[in-house]
């Protein structure tokens, strides 16, 4: 989901001022070795000005970030990680995130490359959802 949010006050990042932001909200389903399933949610602001400071137009950077989130959704749905969320998240970053970023940057001019920080920020919503889902499978968390 892409959720528009207006800020209470303007936030300045270098030469750009942020008055609204789009939050990427994701849902991730996980399954443990016993076949138990849980769903988790994660959200992060796609703060274009902060994650990708550049003279490129806001719309170009914004569209690239949102497209990258959709690519991440596909990649996470196909990722076959096993273990604790810290291990799975680390493995995804090491095995998939860099390749996805290279793919996106391969489609862009050399002076318009999406930075690693932007890729990590987009991925953070999925990492949060992974931890949330894992938490639902742990008996120490009472969500009632």
Regions found by a protein language model. Name each.
Residues 1-27:
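Short, Gly/Pro- and small/polar-rich lid/capping loops
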Residues 38-137:
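Metal- or metallocofactor-binding catalytic centers and their adjacent structured scaffolds
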């Amino acid at each position: 989901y892409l959720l528009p949010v207006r800020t209470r006050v303007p936030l300045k990042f270098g030469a750009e001022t942020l008055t609204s932001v789009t939050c990427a909200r994701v849902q991730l389903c996980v399954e443990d070795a016993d076949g138990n399933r849980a769903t988790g949610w994660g959200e992060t602001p796609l703060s274009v000005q902060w994650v990708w400071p550049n003279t490129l137009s806001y719309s170009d950077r914004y569209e690239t970030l949102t497209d990258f989130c959709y690519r991440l959704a596909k990649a996470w749905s196909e990722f076959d990680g096993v273990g604790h969320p810290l291990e799975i998240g680390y493995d995804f970053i090491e095995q998939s995130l860099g390749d996805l970023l290279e793919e996106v940057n391969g489609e862009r001019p050399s002076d318009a490359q999406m930075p690693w920080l932007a890729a990590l920020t987009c991925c953070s919503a999925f990492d949060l959802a992974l931890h949330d889902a894992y938490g639902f499978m742990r008996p120490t968390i009472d969500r009632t």
